[in-house]
């Protein structure tokens, strides 16, 4: 359980079983967990005195041993298209970004999992910031909590603005595994936000051992940040591919999807970069690569940021690529750029990373994870 500098337990990031354990640890009945969890997530409460069905003696006990603390809101911007972006400060001192995208009757919240990112994908502005820290479970779910309160949609399940959550913000979610899984469990819990497992999506650049582990502990939708149809190009665009090449990666994704059943499919994300990965031969390679993978493809025209070195393809090039994939038998959509006027579009999230020296440490951790997994498989 996460404790603050004051030694108090932050209840915001606790799952229902963890809350039950907490109440037992302070000599209370387990059913109190459900009462308090509803107050936190359905009503956005951060003051124990507001919990009217909790007795005064217990409220005083909670004040002494616990708190409800989300990230600090630094700023909120609203795009001309209705997209919202929150910049929030986490305990490390860094700022991360959360984006809400309204579209039709759906509202999707894009949530960050780390302050910065160690994977250094060449077309992503977050990776250029380096890596600072993993977010705690409270800091991950706290982004949902903050957004929900900002819309005034409490209780959370009445006229809810947030219908979908995607772990596609800053960071690689599978490198902050335990905290992200805890937060997603709260998202799906009826005592939390009651979001369907089909509407909670985790996006990964491809940490293969953790994809397999994810399938063992939770049932959420999976998205793969592919961005290249062959290993040579993907090694340049998504460096973690050197550790987990495409054959290994897609095998892991297929194993994950097969566990889910229910006609679930992998979402493949592909950022289109002018004259880099948008040519007809790339579409042909992609058709061959994904022919045995149940998937839908989401094409993302590159969203420029300073000094990236990349450009957005022309509309004709985007349509040509989409048409070729359609003819190859795939369900293909082109993501509409949203929120670019407030730097909230895909690939533009940067936040403010206070310590940019840890990228190499995170790569070492990835390598050690792969080596230990390989040793386990040999045994």
Curated annotation (Swiss-Prot):
It is an enzyme of class 2 (transferase). S-adenosyl-L-methionine binds at residues 171-172, 203, 225-227, 303. Its main location: cytoplasm. It comes from Pseudomonas aeruginosa (strain ATCC 15692 / DSM 22644 / CIP 104116 / JCM 14847 / LMG 12228 / 1C / PRS 101 / PAO1). [4Fe-4S] cluster binds at residues 117, 121, 124. This is Dual-specificity RNA methyltransferase RlmN. Keywords: 4Fe-4S, Cytoplasm, Disulfide bond, Iron, Iron-sulfur, Metal-binding, Methyltransferase, rRNA processing, S-adenosyl-L-methionine, Transferase, tRNA processing. Belongs to the radical SAM superfamily. RlmN family. Its cofactor is [4Fe-4S] cluster. The keyword Cytoplasm applies. GO terms for molecular function: 4 iron, 4 sulfur cluster binding; metal ion binding; rRNA (adenine(2503)-C2-)-methyltransferase activity; rRNA binding; tRNA (adenine(37)-C2)-methyltransferase activity; tRNA binding.
């Amino acid at each position: 359980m996460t404790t603050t500098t004051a030694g108090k337990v932050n209840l915001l990031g606790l799952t229902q079983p963890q809350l039950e354990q907490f109440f037992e640890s302070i000599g209370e009945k387990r059913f109190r967990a459900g009462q308090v969890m509803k107050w936190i997530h359905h009503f956005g409460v951060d003051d124990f005195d507001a919990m009217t069905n909790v007795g005064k003696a217990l409220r005083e006990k909670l004040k002494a041993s616990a708190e409800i603390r989300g990230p600090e809101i630094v700023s909120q911007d609203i795009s001309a298209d209705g997209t919202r972006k929150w910049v929030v400060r986490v305990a490390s001192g860094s700022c991360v970004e959360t984006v809400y995208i309204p579209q039709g009757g759906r509202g999707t919240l894009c949530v960050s999992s780390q302050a910065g990112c160690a994977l250094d994908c060449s077309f992503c502005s977050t990776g250029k910031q380096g890596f600072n820290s993993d977010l705690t479970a409270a800091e991950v779910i706290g982004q949902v909590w903050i957004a929900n309160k900002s819309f005034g949609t409490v209780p959370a399940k009445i006229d809810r603005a947030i219908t979908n959550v995607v772990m596609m913000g800053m960071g690689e979610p599978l490198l902050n595994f335990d905290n992200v899984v805890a937060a997603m469990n709260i998202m799906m819990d009826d005592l939390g936000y009651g979001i369907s497992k089909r509407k909670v999506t985790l996006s990964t650049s491809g940490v293969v051992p953790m994809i397999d582990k994810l399938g063992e502990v939770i049932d959420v939708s999976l998205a793969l940040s592919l961005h290249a149809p062959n290993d040579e190009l993907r090694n340049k665009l998504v460096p973690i591919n050197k550790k987990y090449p495409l054959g290994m990666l897609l095998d892991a994704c297929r194993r994950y999807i097969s566990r889910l059943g229910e006609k679930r499919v992998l979402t493949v994300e592909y950022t289109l970069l002018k004259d880099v990965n948008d040519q007809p031969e790339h579409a042909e390679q992609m058709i061959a690569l994904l022919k045995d993978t149940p998937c839908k493809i989401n094409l993302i025209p590159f969203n420029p940021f300073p000094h990236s070195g990349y450009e957005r393809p022309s509309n004709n090039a985007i349509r040509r690529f989409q048409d070729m994939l359609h003819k190859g038998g795939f369900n293909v959509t082109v993501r509409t750029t949203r929120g670019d006027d407030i730097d909230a579009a895909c690939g533009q999230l940067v936040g403010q990373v206070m310590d940019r020296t840890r990228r190499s440490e995170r790569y070492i951790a990835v390598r050690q994870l792969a080596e230990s997994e390989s040793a386990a498989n040999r045994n």
